[in-house]
């Protein structure tokens, strides 16, 4: 099609929003719960994360200082449903320690006037926090305009011909941020819509027949 491939990005957002409606992602009662979820969701499904978070809620532990002070073995058992619980317990302690020592809590961190790129660099300096996790925390916990790229994003937009399937994380992130309005809610919704679309249609084995954006797709 003659349309610039990057111009598709915003058009596809509007089509997906019309098709699926608002996703209202991230489901959390507090900013810190988003941080916890961003760590726990690494390499697992959200259903498993929900089970782990519910365990923490049952023990009244979803606060920064409480997570810092809880025995690590107890924490491991509580987050076991999310998998890789030994690793994630350490990562959860690491990111929480950083927040408490530098900001007091996540609410205060969200109020800082530091530039988003500085905050991102701080998060990436924490052991166990990669780019997707850092951007998830920035976007959904701290309300910063930092687009989240995940495996679904790469799969879907390489099939659409917008990105090369070997494109690096920051390259993909930059393409989205340059071709979308700089709008917090659009960033939040679009990431969630991509996830939903890849679960419904753009699976590993794609279901193209009734896909709402198949007119744009090179793989159909």
Curated annotation (Swiss-Prot):
The keyword 4Fe-4S is annotated on this UniProt entry: yes
GO MF: 4 iron, 4 sulfur cluster binding; catalytic activity, acting on DNA; hydrolase activity; metal ion binding
UniProt binding sites for [4Fe-4S] cluster: 202, 208, 211, 217
Parts forming coiled coils: none
Manner of cofactor binding, per the entry note: Binds 1 [4Fe-4S] cluster.
SUPFAM superfamilies named among the record's database cross-references: DNA-glycosylase (SSF48150)
UniProtKB keywords: 4Fe-4S, Iron, Iron-sulfur, Metal-binding
Cofactor: [4Fe-4S] cluster
Similarity section: Belongs to the Nth/MutY family.
Protein known as: Putative DNA repair glycosylase MJ1434
Species of the source: Methanocaldococcus jannaschii (strain ATCC 43067 / DSM 2661 / JAL-1 / JCM 10045 / NBRC 100440)
Source species taxonomy: Archaea, Methanobacteriati, Methanobacteriota, Methanomada group, Methanococci
